[in-house]
Structure formats: C-alpha cells, structure tokens
C-alpha cells in the first residue's frame, strides 16, 4: 500500500473508534523519518487502547504489519510505526502538551473529518470532506 493511501486508511480506522481532531501531516519535504504522521485525540485511556488496537487490526487485515509500537503501558500516547506512516494516538491533554502539529509546523496539514460530523448535504451524497491547512475544502466521492 502506498504511504498516502496507508495514512488515509489509518485515519479512517481512528475515526471508526470515535477518535477526533484527526490530522495527516505530510512530512516528505521536511524529513526522511517518515512520509506521514496521522494524529488523533481521544477522551480516555480505554479509548486510546481501542483506537490503537483497531488501527493495528485493520492494518493487519490489509497485510500491513506494525514495525514498532510504543505506549501501551501508560495509555496516554501510543505510537504505531508503519515505517512510511507513523500513527500517534493521544489522550487529549497529552496531545496539547506535546503539540506535534506545532513541532512539525512546516508540514502540509490535512484535517480528516467524520462523515457524521459533516454538513447534511455532503453526508447525503456519501462524500467525505478533508480540509488542508490552507482551509481549502476537498470533496471526494
């Protein structure tokens, strides 16, 4: 699976477990550490684990194995490293403390929204909406 597709799939899996403020950071022009970060927030340590487990299971079903993971002990910030794409699942207070979006502020940022939170007209048409850092809306079918 190509990195951009993998990042979008991870974002969808996060949203399926009610993660919110899901963003994809495009790091290709900034670092060689990873092509994309996918970052989300959760409301509890139980939800942190549920989101991480769902991402791992969903990626396993797509024959994408996690290369390294960290954070299952504290359940405040779990990192799932898929080499080209790194998923960051945060408890909401920890996300604001570490503020990866600011740290990687030069990266192109795409906000991924849940279709249930979209305006009714777009949701009826079966479209998902993403928003880039330039506040430009992109609709996909």
Regions found by a protein language model. Name each.
Residues 78, 88-90, 95-108, 120:
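RNA pseudouridine synthases
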Residues 114-141:
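Intrinsically disordered, low-complexity charged/polar segments
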Residues 22-33, 65-84:
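Glycine/charge-rich, flexible interdomain linkers and switch-proximal surface loops
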Residues 1-21:
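Surface-exposed, low-hydrophobicity interaction/linker segments
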Residues 39-41:
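Short hydrophobic/aromatic beta-strand micro-patches
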Residues 13, 17, 58-62, 92-93, ...:
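Conserved, well-folded catalytic cores of nucleic-acid-processing
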Residues 47-61, 79:
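Compact, glycine-rich, soluble single-domain proteins
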